[in-house]
Amino acid sequence: MDATAFHPSLWGDFFVKYEPPTAPKRGHMTQRAELLKEEVRKTLKAAANQIKNALDLIITLQRLGLDHHYENEISELLRFVYSSSDYDDKDLYVVSLRFYLLRKHGHRVSSDVFMSFKDEEGNFVVDDTKCLLSLYNAAYLMTHGEKVLDEAITFTRRQLEALLLDPLEPALADEVYLTLQTPLFRRLRILEAVNYIPIYGKEAGRNEAILELAKLNFNLAQLIYCEELKEVTLWWKQLNVETNLSFIRDRIVECHFWMTGACCEPRYSLSRVIATKMTALITVLDDMMDTYSTTEEAMLLAEAIYRWEENAAELLPGYMKHFYLYLLKTIDSCGGELGPNRSFRTFYLKEMLKVFVRGSSQEIKWRNENYVPKTISEHLEHSGPTVGAFQVACSSFVGMGDNITKESFEWLLTYPELVKSLMNIARLLNDTASTKREQTAGHHVSTVQCYMLKHGTTMDEACEKIKELTEDSWKDMMELYLTPTEHPKLVAQTIVDFARTADYMYKETDGFTFSHTIKDMIAKLFVDPISLF
């Protein structure tokens, strides 16, 4: 792709000066939110006596982005739900919601519970919209071989699509539309909160304290996000992209949006900042090596990154030198931000960058030799690491707490199967979104083109096959997510969150490269507060 085809930044210096209109009310909002948190906590404790009420409350708190305030209470409640048989197993809504929440929290529950909702011919018998939505969302937490969940998706999708042809209550119509667009488990948690708050506000049975807390919680988080955006924008400006690197994708705000989609809780501010910088640096590396540089220049840059020392800059062409030195300076400064007990983690940032350039070098070799990988598996082995999902997910752990240990970082660098499933999802989604653009731009063959050439299919047929492989990778991820490891559950949860961001960014097109497609959602997340009235 000609570098000039990348559109310029849509945001420029906007966030350097921007403050949301709620900023002067921060103190009052914080005090009010603390009072409401305790009121909602009492409601949560009172729900423990009735499983259906408990499940309804948990899913509401999750969708409104409030569950991180009640992690211990929710975990305790779900342990009770898991061990109790005191619920109506003839109520499909309850059975589906129980299945969804337990699997989402890592409990391995059987999908056989849905067999009783079929008739003698093996067809589902459901006509209630709320039950259809609950079953559809539950079915997307499937692993391989769960035929009943595959059948549930086919059945419920057909029913829900038919429902949209008839008038529905506004809140229910919104729910059906959102669900068909993206099942609940795959939605970005912070965007789900933004979208669900107005829907919940229309529900007759809403809890006013929960609704008010959700609005305050989002507006307070937005203030933190905007502070981070100012910091990373000022950092980015020092690269002087418009003059020195005019050929790259200038997407610092989109990088932060990506990281916020995966790690939205306020306590992960440092994590978001470090991961945003890492994502932006990887974007520069990708555009240099994949789009702009000659093969010789790209190999020189790779060698400099392997060496990781200032004097290696002398080997580089002029346009690379400043970037390379700024890269080294940025990673070193991360060590200072982390403090003495966690500064060792910068070693892993360096290693992740080396993994990226190693994979990019292999892709350049393929392109120059017109080599087509023999199988999709061979392709993914080399192209998975260059999609960047592994690097940005791991870099987010660098800024997290001490529960992410050195052993966890060492484990991540071995490419465990959970990480591979993330890389596969991101690569396959990226390829289906961008293959038509890249096919005409002299890139190495994508997984889509690889399949076309090996099987003699059209591009549309190949894209459908790649979508099937993407779904298989989601099943891989779910199986691995349910498998206990010695590492904190936060690691697996965050990796799943990064798969969700890939799904969002590449669902219809390459939303990162062509970021006008996500501009409105960025504004909803970072610019527009939610009205409290």
From Swiss-Prot:
It is an enzyme of class 4 (lyase). Its main location: cytoplasm. Its EC number is 4.2.3.47. InterPro entries: Isoprenoid_synthase_dom_sf, Terpene_cyclase-like_1_C, Terpene_cyclase_plant_C1, Terpene_synth_N, Terpene_synth_N_sf, Terpene_synthase-like, Terpene_synthase_metal-bd, Terpenoid_cyclase/PrenylTrfase. One of its GO terms (cellular component) is cytoplasm. Pathway: Secondary metabolite biosynthesis; terpenoid biosynthesis. Its cofactor is Mg(2+); Co(2+); Mn(2+). Mg(2+) 3 binds at residues 430, 434, 438. Keywords: Cytoplasm, Lyase, Magnesium, Manganese, Metal-binding, Plant defense. Sesquiterpene cyclase catalyzing the production of sixfold more beta-farnesene than alpha-bergamotene from farnesyl diphosphate. Involved in indirect defense by producing volatile signals attracting natural enemies of herbivores. This is (E)-beta-farnesene synthase. The lineage of its organism: Eukaryota, Viridiplantae, Streptophyta, Embryophyta, Tracheophyta.
